Swiss-Prot record:
It comes from Enterobacter sp. (strain 638). It holds the Pfam family GAD. GO terms for biological process: aspartyl-tRNA aminoacylation. ATP binds at residues 217-219, 226, 482, 534-537. Belongs to the class-II aminoacyl-tRNA synthetase family. Type 1 subfamily. Its main location: cytoplasm. It is found in: Cytoplasm. Coiled coil: none annotated. GO terms for cellular component: cytoplasm. Residues 195-198 are annotated as: Aspartate. Keywords: Aminoacyl-tRNA synthetase, ATP-binding, Cytoplasm, Ligase, Nucleotide-binding, Protein biosynthesis. One of its GO terms (molecular function) is nucleic acid binding. This is Aspartate--tRNA ligase. Catalyzes the attachment of L-aspartate to tRNA(Asp) in a two-step reaction: L-aspartate is first activated by ATP to form Asp-AMP and then transferred to the acceptor end of tRNA(Asp).
Length: 590
């Protein structure tokens, strides 16, 4: 039906007859001439109808926005005064000779001239996706997956599919369950990741596996989370953690170079402990220059319990955050930031305004200054690197609250005060995570997943002191987003059972839930390691949006609903009966 895409026409096509198909993006009727901007997935080109082609001109008078049409015409060079430098096709136009209206369009429920609500965009997603910026994002996503496949193929990886209907296993979030008609009362689970299957593929001898795969997690959603999402899933045998990181870093660097023309350079490596200490986060945004600085040792003897209490507590922390230029913040702004940190468990926000650094305690303004002597103030100013016009905020509480509160404040201030360099790319690896964390009920839970190996510990050592174990795990972080994470896996049956035991999974449960894995570990399992990237997050970064729904063709809302199809929906009673399922309705409270 067509010979060219609209957006691909250039000067080299001048004089050629072309047939184009697409949608009317805009129409301008000048009486004897009608101009339209014709749009397809590749872009927009100007088409005009003149009186010499009377039949086409007459039909063109009926055109309205979003009519689907076919146009045949001749490509012409525009007069120099009419060249549009803002359009890729701005040096040419098409003189139409024939026009076919394939389908007319009703008035649109979306307004192309204004910002539409996200609810409207999701309800009429098929119209929203016609917008050039949305089409470009999905084209970039397709390019990314193509580049990934080429890279993985070039490095000897095999693309192997794993099951979508599998067994429910505890991986940290709730499973989406699928009832079995054949085995009434039993359920499949949609995979949260192909984790165990890719490990089994290594045990099967495939050595290098990858897959671009859908995963499902029934969890509370955030702005950058979806109930179904896509992973670039990778697993290797006989490779160390540094080797896996080197290879996956090369993959990501190649994506940025091909898609953005940016060389990311070598990724720095930072331990979990250092990231938490300096940035209050295990996914630090290194574009932001501010850092948390420990000052507890300076405040142990002050007669101010808010500081001295945590300063003398082994589980406590007192940290300072220097904000360049922050002394200009108003009282209301300071109060707002104080309320902000309360979201993260902090009780408030002490501060020092530095007006004249050279005067020491005489050159500051602070509601806590009366508790501090000149020597302490000077030490704080020196340690934080404070200068005239700076603000120093303090966090004093248990270590987690201080890290969470000041870490979040650091990000907010970086954005509010334009301290974060938005034009910069800041990738890094975070390594050496704790293997376990407190589950809040006196037990331990795996920080990554139960199949991650410990670093430099055997089973007996791990059993004796699990809370000290460091996981052989690694996360890739770019601009404050965790884009990928992985680990060296356990390849010993004894070690795997030890980890299960530490997590409170008894031997009977181990057999019921993971018997197939424990059996497989008996037969010469190779050392193996892997990683999974979030394709949606990578695409989000590479297309410059901060909304993950912008890079998914048909996403769900934060309530896990599809506004377009109205999923989820009630099932047919006959289908439920066939599955042996009764729906228990909640009683409505009066």
């Amino acid at each position: 039906m067509r010979t060219e895409y609209c957006g691909q026409l250039r000067q080299s096509h001048v004089g050629q007859q072309v047939t184009l198909c697409g949608w009317v993006n805009r129409r301008r009727d000048l009486g004897s001439l009608i101009f339209i901007d014709l749009r397809d997935r590749e872009g927009i080109v100007q088409v005009f109808f003149d009186p010499d082609r009377a039949e086409a001109l007459k039909l063109a008078s009926e055109l309205r926005n979003e009519f689907c049409i076919q146009v045949t015409g001749t490509v012409r060079a525009r007069d120099e005064k009419n060249i549009n430098a803002d359009m890729a096709t701005g040096e040419i136009e098409v003189l139409a000779s024939d026009l076919t209206i394939i389908n007319r369009s009703e008035s649109l429920p979306l307004d192309s001239n204004h910002v539409n609500t996200e609810e409207a965009r999701l309800k009429f997603r098929y119209l929203d996706l016609r917008r050039p910026e949305m089409a470009q994002r999905l084209k970039t996503r397709a390019k990314i997956t193509s580049l990934v496949r080429r890279f993985m193929d070039d490095h000897g990886f095999l693309d192997i599919e794993t099951p979508m209907l599998t067994k429910a296993t505890p991986e940290g979030a709730r499973d989406y369950l699928v009832p079995s008609r054949v085995h009434k009362g039993k359920f499949y689970a949609l995979p949260q990741s192909p984790q165990l299957f890719k490990q089994l593929l290594m045990m099967s001898g495939f050595d290098r596996y990858y897959q671009i795969v859908k995963c499902f997690r029934d969890e509370d959603l955030r702005a950058d989370r979806q109930p179904e999402f896509t992973q670039i899933d990778v697993e290797t045998s006989f490779m160390t953690a540094p080797q896996v990181r080197e290879l996956m870093e090369a993959l990501v660097r190649s994506l940025w170079l091909d898609v953005k023309g940016v060389d990311l350079g070598d990724f720095p490596i930072m331990t979990f402990a250092e990231a938490e200490r300096r940035y209050g986060s295990d996914k630090p945004d290194l574009r932001n220059p501010m850092e948390l600085v420990d000052v507890a040792d300076l405040l142990k003897a002050v007669e101010f319990a808010v500081f001295s209490g945590p300063a003398n507590d082994a589980k406590g922390r007192v940290a300072a955050l220097r904000v360049p230029g922050g002394a200009s913040l108003s009282r209301k702004q300071i109060d707002d930031y104080g309320n902000f940190v309360k979201i993260y468990g902090a009780k408030g926000l002490a501060y020092i305004k530095v007006t004249e650094r050279a005067k020491g305690i005489e050159g500051i303004t602070s509601p806590v200054a009366k508790f501090l002597n000149a020597e302490i103030v000077e030490s704080i100013l020196e340690r934080t690197g404070a200068q005239d016009g700076d603000m120093i905020f303090f966090g004093a509480d248990n270590k987690k609250v201080v890290a969470d509160a000041l870490g979040a404040l650091r990000l907010k201030l970086g954005k509010d005060l334009s301290l974060t360099d938005e034009a910069k790319w800041a990738p890094l690896w975070v390594i050496d995570f704790p293997m376990f964390e407190d589950d809040g009920e006196g037990g331990l839970t795996a920080m990554h997943h139960p199949f991650t190996s410990a670093k430099d510990m055997n089973a007996d050592e791990l059993k004796a002191a699990p809370e000290t174990a460091i996981a052989n795990a690694y996360d890739m972080v770019i601009n404050g987003y965790e884009v990928g994470g992985g680990s060296v896996r356990i390849h010993s049956g004894e070690m795997q059972q030890t980890v299960f035991g530490i997590l409170g999974i008894n031997e009977q449960e181990q057999r019921e839930k993971f018997g197939f894995l424990l059996d497989a570990l008996k037969y010469g399992t190779p050392p193996h390691a892997g990683l999974a990237f979030g394709l949606d997050r990578l695409t989000m970064l590479l297309t410059g949006t901060d909304n993950i729904r912008d890079v998914i063709a048909f996403p769900k809302t934060t309530a896990a609903a599809c506004l377009m199809t109205e999923a989820p929906s009630f099932a047919n009673p006959a289908s439920l009966a066939e599955l042996g399922i009764d729906v228990v309705k909640k009683e409505e409270k009066n």
